[in-house]
């Protein structure tokens, strides 16, 4: 998406980009990261992974893992083995369009239903699997809304959730409603305005790569091992 189109859409949702923001840096986020993973939806129940990671990308990001998801996936696979963890991005009805950020829950109802369906699949396909989740920007709002809306029996199977640039951080008091705070890790950079109730995109919103390569997956790995043991 070109910078002009992006700023026009943001203006339509009562948001604006700082004029000092570098065009190329913004486009690197919006156009980069085209990885798609559908291990859960394509997987066979006879060969379930012990761990299933469900992730929602940020607005306009390509693939279903966007820019941050692949880094988390790589670290999880190093910890649990390629066959030990399934990676599943949220696609389908989740279009990651900019306008949906202005909706009451920070994303569309259709997107929430899509992610809810992914959380529900393992209940029949891989009932013994441990679930972990994450999301970036609009995807963080989507992950939070989906986890909040789950039946408690399925929600209790989620060992941990990581949220980057959480667009509902202020509104939800830095947590996911109806979900334990100790199983939630929110990454909000200093100066990331979306974490303080705005939809203005500033440079700190685009610099969560180091967190996705280190602290975020490490948190998830720790939470999984607390449930399943260190094996």
UniProtKB/Swiss-Prot annotation:
Stored InterPro entries: AB_hydrolase_fold, Cutinase/axe, CUTINASE_1, CUTINASE_2, Cutinase_monf
- Catalytic residues of the enzyme: 137, 192, 205
User: Catalytic activity, per the record?
Assistant: cutin + H2O = cutin monomers
Q: Name one GO cellular component term.
A: extracellular region
Please state the span of the N-terminal signal peptide per the UniProt entry.
1-16
Asked whether the keyword Cytoplasm is assigned, the reply is no
Where does it live in the cell? Secreted
Q: Which UniProt keywords apply?
A: Disulfide bond, Hydrolase, Secreted, Serine esterase, Signal, Virulence
Q: Which GO terms describe its biological process?
A: carbohydrate catabolic process
Give GO terms: molecular function aspect only: cutinase activity
SMART domains per the UniProt record, alphabetical: Cutinase
The protein's matches in SUPFAM superfamilies, at most eight in alphabetical order, are given as: alpha/beta-Hydrolases
UniProt-listed Enzyme Commission number(s): 3.1.1.74
Q: Which family does it belong to?
A: Belongs to the cutinase family.
Write the protein's name: Cutinase 3
Q: Which organism's genome codes for this protein?
A: Fusarium vanettenii (Neocosmospora pisi)
């Amino acid at each position: 998406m070109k910078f002009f189109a992006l700023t026009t859409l943001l203006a339509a949702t009562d948001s604006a980009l700082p004029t000092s923001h570098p065009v190329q840096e913004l486009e690197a986020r919006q156009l980069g990261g085209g990885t798609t993973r559908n291990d859960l939806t394509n997987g066979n129940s006879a060969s379930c992974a012990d761990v299933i990671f469900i992730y929602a990308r940020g607005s306009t990001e390509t693939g279903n893992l966007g820019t941050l998801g692949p880094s988390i996936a790589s670290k999880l696979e190093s910890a649990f083995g390629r066959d030990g963890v399934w990676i599943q991005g949220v696609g389908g009805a989740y279009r990651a369009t900019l306008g949906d950020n202005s909706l009451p829950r920070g994303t569309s109802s259709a997107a929430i239903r899509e992610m809810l369906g992914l959380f529900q699949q393992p209940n029949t396909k891989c009932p013994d699997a441990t679930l972990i989740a994450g999301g970036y920007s609009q995807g963080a709002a989507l992950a939070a809304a989906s986890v909040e809306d789950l039946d408690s029996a399925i929600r209790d199977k989620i060992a941990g959730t990581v949220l980057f640039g959480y667009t509902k951080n202020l509104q939800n008091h830095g947590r996911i409603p109806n979900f334990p705070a100790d199983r939630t890790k929110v990454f909000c950079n200093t100066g990331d305005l979306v974490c303080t109730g705005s939809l203005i995109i500033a440079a700190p919103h685009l610099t969560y790569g180091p967190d996705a390569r280190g602290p975020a997956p490490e948190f998830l790995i720790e939470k999984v091992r607390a449930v399943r043991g260190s094996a």
